[in-house]
Swiss-Prot record:
Function comment: Catalyzes the decarboxylation of orotidine 5'-monophosphate (OMP) to uridine 5'-monophosphate (UMP).
One BP annotation, GO: 'de novo' pyrimidine nucleobase biosynthetic process
Name recorded for this polypeptide: Orotidine 5'-phosphate decarboxylase
Keyword Lyase tagged: yes
Signal sequence, renumbered to the chain: none
Binding positions for substrate per the UniProt entry: 22, 44, 71-80, 131, 192, 201, 221-222
Lineage, uppermost ranks: Bacteria, Pseudomonadati, Pseudomonadota, Gammaproteobacteria, Enterobacterales
Length: 245
């Protein structure tokens, strides 16, 4: 895989690293952000922080120069999902996502909502199977497919609906690149440098392994946010990825 910048005109980095900002406190989050360089990563804002601090928090991160992945995983009736995705585009985020399990009509409505934004539209990504889920979790929901097979089915639907890519586990990346092509972007949580604790992720991989597997954007949280020197940790990860590319 070649390390390339996003097609978004807002992109300020060609690093595939997206740091997950999982903080309970706004000041703690901004204190961390002020220690790192927007040229070394993008930032992911999820449900907790967005619910606590709202769009203004996203704007504060953007004012510091960061591209933002708004990880709210919209899953609703088509009209509501479309309006939510358009609101994310109005906020100027770099990437936004929905749940593929919302179905084709919901995903098509979301994609169509971004057409007026042209080249300024955020990347539109769908979540397939959460990386915390195992086969037993899917069985509880009445899904008899393995996590990998179910994720591939949802990814195929996502591509059919015209999305830019999917969130998937790194283990699915090789297969997905073969099936869906190089332009279909793969966003992968559960990426942890060698020696990091697995935390609540079940299907994990190192950054170097993820790059080799074809992952386009790798989400890394606590190994960076809890690092004594997060700026150096990011530089070390990016350097290792450049060596592996």
């Amino acid at each position: 895989m070649t390390l390339t910048a996003s097609s978004s005109s807002r992109a300020v980095t060609n690093s595939p690293v997206v740091v997950a900002l999982d903080y309970h406190n706004r000041d703690d989050a901004l204190s961390f952000v002020d220690k790192i360089d927007p040229r070394d990563c993008r930032l992911k804002v999820g449900k907790e922080m967005f619910t606590l601090f709202g769009p203004q928090f996203v704007r504060e991160l953007q004012q510091r120069g960061f591209d933002i992945f708004l990880d709210l995983k919209f899953h609703d009736i088509p009209n509501t999902a479309a309006h939510a995705v358009a609101a994310a585009a109005d906020l100027g985020v770099w990437m936004v996502n929905v749940h593929a399990s919302g179905g084709a009509r919901m995903m098509t409505a979301a994609r169509e909502a971004l057409v007026p934004y042209g080249k300024d539209a955020p990347l539109l990504i769908a979540v397939t199977v959460l990386t915390s889920m195992e086969a037993s979790d899917l069985a509880d929901l009445g899904v008899t497919l393995s996590p990998a097979d179910y994720a591939e089915r949802l990814a195929a639907l996502t591509q059919k609906c015209g999305f830019d890519g999917v969130v998937c586990s790194a283990q699915e990346a090789v297969r997905f690149k073969q099936v869906f092509g190089q332009e279909f972007k793969l966003v992968t949580p559960g990426i942890r440098p060698q020696g990091s604790d697995a935390g609540d992720q079940r299907r994990i991989m190192t950054p170097e392994q993820a790059l080799a597997a074809g992952v386009d954007y790798m989400v890394i949280g606590r190994p960076v946010t809890q690092s004594v020197d997060p700026a150096q940790t990011l530089k070390a990860i990016n350097a290792s990825l450049q060596r592996s590319a």
